[in-house]
Amino acid sequence: MTNQTRNVVVVDCLRTPMGRSKGGAFRHTRAEDLSAHLMKGILARNPQVNPSEIEDIYWGCVQQTLEQGFNIARNAALLAGLPIEIGAVTVNRLCGSSMQALHDGTRAIMTGDAEICLIGGVEHMGHVPMNHGVDFHPGMSKNVAKAAGMMGLTAEMLGKLHGISREQQDEFAARSHARAHAATLEGRFKNEILPTEGHAADGTLFQLDYDEVIRPETTVEGLSQLRPVFDPANGTVTAGTSSALSDGASAMLIMSEEKANELGLKIRARIKGMAIAGCDPSIMGYGPVPATQKALKRAGLAIEDMDVVELNEAFAAQSLPCAKDLGLLEVMDEKVNLNGGAIALGHPLGCSGARISTTLINLMEAKDAKYGLATMCIGLGQGIATVFERP
């Protein structure tokens, strides 16, 4: 370890298209395949990097069982044919897993334990459902409401506490689909999506190069017809205002600033600040607020300094209170989730942290922005945030 921490930079970031979990293009594609494809793809885009110099792979994944079990990070690296000397570990901080992978890799480089790390994450929610094998200890109910394990009910609770109306949620969800669809049509996702083999409806193989989860036909009127799904009698949260179920993977290539300069690689962003925070599990969706406040303080910046923000859209009823308390509601159209978010693209749990960071970096470049924030809520009451700076 060195005594002085070093600057850590992102030299590239990439993701698969988001596949629909129910009968989508990746229905015959395993989570390891999505991961291995990205690992190979990001290295192919950066031939200056000798794979043997990668110290470790940190890969987020939540449901670590079945095809995602037994250290999927290592399994995917072996499947990709990467040098056997590279280490690999699977990281789990639920929804924040691949952002946690970014933080872990960043710290390893900061302290001098690594020069180059590959980070990312995956979740195939079609093959391994979110609730597969979940078995909470009954004694937890002494400290945590049972409903805190039901994400939709925590969104209902947070929405009620902050007076978020059904209409506001429907408008936010329609915005997500509209912006994601516009981003697709205008090619704004092109640089971040690695075309990935999938199966068409008739079973033939094809290269998927767009997010098939987006519903361009979504309207506020259409959403208003949906029934509340978690609290049918009194609720406001519907399937339409919740993040879609999707399958996908994301990856980022990070290294010390010195190494990037030595290899002649373009520095796309620096990691400027990182934080996690806990909050009441019953309003787990509020986690981005304390996590962002911590990360900004560590970066010596304020929310007003952020030119672009990616706030993971677990639920509209959760995103809006966070945006409100972070002081972002007035600048939504200039700064927040400009290419839509998880309501349109889906929230493959282990993938999303690096996914929103990848989208953020591409948006920062498109807007010639200096600072950006990526933040997300985490089941059972946590938040995670990363502040990025463009050189």
UniProtKB/Swiss-Prot annotation:
EC number: 2.3.1.16
Claim: Protein biosynthesis is one of the keywords in the record: no
Pfam entry (one): Thiolase_N
Assigned GO CC terms: cytoplasm
Catalytic activity: an acyl-CoA + acetyl-CoA = a 3-oxoacyl-CoA + CoA
Signal peptide feature range: none
Function (record text): Catalyzes the final step of fatty acid oxidation in which acetyl-CoA is released and the CoA ester of a fatty acid two carbons shorter is formed.
Subunit structure, interactors included: Heterotetramer of two alpha chains (FadB) and two beta chains (FadA).
NCBIfam families: AcCoA-C-Actrans (TIGR01930), fadA (TIGR02445), PRK08947.1 (NF006510)
Name of the featured protein: 3-ketoacyl-CoA thiolase
